[in-house]
């Protein structure tokens, strides 16, 4: 082969060498039984048509490229946000390998999580013995202060009872009776990763507070509880902390994985780092109130907080963009009695200045976007504030109430009149939409790059560039440290959007003596 020790080539140029071209051609001709290229081209072109879109949208029992993940993924992220807590998945090793690699690739960090290795025998006879041995081994080997248990499809299909299994493990001495093992049933065949986060948080809150409410007094600790929900931008944890600190507000961030998912390379491995303490969780009912940063996917959490903690959860939206950050800060000020400081007022003014500076480039630009319910709703709201036009809005794990709420936001703005909201649809549906009604850009996670590739394959004039905002981001580095919440997050989103537009304009206008009449130095 053409790889030389003294001149190592990366995979992309290497596979362009003639040796590899010949090898791949022989593989195709000898083993792949490939269809004729003209037939492949014909089918590709057909999949870009309105006729195919109509057939595509009639799918009922098939998902192609889902824009969501399964419940235990969210449960693992929630558990990682608590101090010295080991996420424990009652299921097979393969599932946990998937969760860990998913987070590894997004955060570029080692992610600790264990399973109790259920196999065929456990699927038939139940996984109680796996649970007993697994809890014992986990505690002895990794020495956590808490083990947070969730489930996979296998355990849910056969009906394993986590409460009974954990109690039996304690009764038989596999783990001490006082050792905290909160749990949540997280069946992958309903809901999504955001549902799993909600279920796990409710399970942890229930474990630490349900039976100890007698001495709790709402407001006695003078703090505000902040529940982030399924959040994968580490900068968002930091910006919320910063804004509350600048206001002088006492707070408890309930599930805070910021440190464990961003540990330094200083020669010391940290299996555990930072996180919400058990004492903070036990004290949470004494707070002035509880604010949910992503209320659309925290339904069980809200029900528990209102029903058990007796907190009147304020009706807020995710603090993205200008208006909803205003509402968040004003509500925090109202609850805490602390004024909004001049530093945040100045920060708001800078955002408004940036919006004014860039509005001529953003105005009227058409976007397709997808992601989780709260994120998509917040992004739609901010796009409208910028004068952009969201046209294809897809949320695979959204529900009818969410769609109705987004439709109302769109109806309140002149820039939302051409938008359509899709729930329960996947990225193959979105692919059809961007072919038949082309937007200027897509906003979403890394999986959108294949849609961009397909649109480019049809022709340069059909290409829809991807702007990477969302989860997961596998093919770019360090974006997970960015911010999307607060005024700071709005500034970062605005900067990303307008510079993507200008980069695209430069790309289209750098043709020498052809299009470079608009290849301007100043934009």
From Swiss-Prot:
Nitrogenase holoenzyme is subject to 'conformational protection' by FeSII; under oxidizing conditions FeSII binds to the holoenzyme and reversibly protects it from oxidation. GO terms for molecular function: ATP binding; iron-sulfur cluster binding; metal ion binding; nitrogenase activity. Induction: Constitutively expressed during log and stationary phase in sucrose-limited cultures, its levels decrease during stationary phase (at protein level). Its cofactor is [8Fe-7S] cluster. It comes from the Bacteria. InterPro entries: ChlB/BchB/BchZ (IPR050152), Nase/OxRdtase_comp1 (IPR000510), Nase_comp1_CS (IPR000318), Nase_Mo-Fe_CF_bsu (IPR005976), Nase_Mo-Fe_CF_bsu_N (IPR024564). PROSITE patterns: NITROGENASE_1_1, NITROGENASE_1_2. Binds 1 [8Fe-7S] cluster per heterodimer. Its EC number is 1.18.6.1. The keyword Magnesium does not apply. It is an enzyme of class 1 (oxidoreductase). [8Fe-7S] cluster binds at residues 70, 95, 153, 188. Keywords: ATP-binding, Iron, Iron-sulfur, Metal-binding, Nitrogen fixation, Nucleotide-binding, Oxidoreductase. GO terms for biological process: nitrogen fixation. It catalyses: N2 + 8 reduced [2Fe-2S]-[ferredoxin] + 16 ATP + 16 H2O = H2 + 8 oxidized [2Fe-2S]-[ferredoxin] + 2 NH4(+) + 16 ADP + 16 phosphate + 6 H(+). One of its GO terms (cellular component) is molybdenum-iron nitrogenase complex. This molybdenum-iron protein is part of the nitrogenase complex that catalyzes the key enzymatic reactions in nitrogen fixation. Belongs to the NifD/NifK/NifE/NifN family. PANTHER family: LIGHT-INDEPENDENT PROTOCHLOROPHYLLIDE REDUCTASE SUBUNIT B. Tetramer of two alpha and two beta chains. Forms complex with the iron protein (nitrogenase component 2). This is Nitrogenase molybdenum-iron protein beta chain. It comes from Azotobacter vinelandii.
